[in-house]
Amino acid sequence: MSTLSEVKAPTSTEQPATNEATTPPEIKTTFTSEEIQKLLPHRYPFLLVDKIIDYTPGKQAVGIKNVTINEPHFTGHFPDRPLMPGVLIVEAMAQVGGIVMTQLPGLEGGLFVFAGIDKVRFRRQVVPGDQLVMTVELLWIKQRRFGKMQARAEVDGQLAAEGELMFSLIN
């Protein structure tokens, strides 16, 4: 049995044994509000994603938006019957898509903006108290500058909005 004084400590040129080489880096599959703010340039009142609950690198993300009566657009849209404007539902889906785009290898930190929207349809009203669950899937990316995504927004399992979103990387 060895005593503490008999155990040889690593010298300055020796490194303690670790299993870093055999452990692959952990793939992040969720993002908090604070982490989203490090990835997207949007801030209140225009940051429309509260958290990412599922993320598959280079493929898709699922984000959550908790809709509350305290949001400024409800003051005028509409005073006696508050509805989340459709354009903000589309923007919320696009922000979830932005998480996918900004995490693509070699494009980290890039600023992606809307290049177009197609086939957008609104199927259900979104009102204060709803939780909007948005799933955005990358369909393709060209020349590492343009991308197209399929997006869906649901409330309580019911489709609220869907459409195709196009993005462009700006310098």
Swiss-Prot record:
Q: Which principal EC class is assigned to this enzyme?
A: lyase
* UniProt subcellular location: Cytoplasm
Instruction: Name the UniProt key words of this record, in alphabetical order.
Output: Cytoplasm, Lipid A biosynthesis, Lipid biosynthesis, Lipid metabolism, Lyase
| GO biological process: one example | fatty acid biosynthetic process
Reactions that this protein is recorded to catalyse: a (3R)-hydroxyacyl-[ACP] = a (2E)-enoyl-[ACP] + H2O
Q: Which GO terms describe its molecular function?
A: (3R)-hydroxyacyl-[acyl-carrier-protein] dehydratase activity
What is this protein called in UniProt?
3-hydroxyacyl-[acyl-carrier-protein] dehydratase FabZ
Species name: Nostoc sp. (strain PCC 7120 / SAG 25.82 / UTEX 2576)
Q: What Gene3D superfamilies does its record include? A: Hotdog Thioesterase
Highest taxon, organism lineage: Bacteria
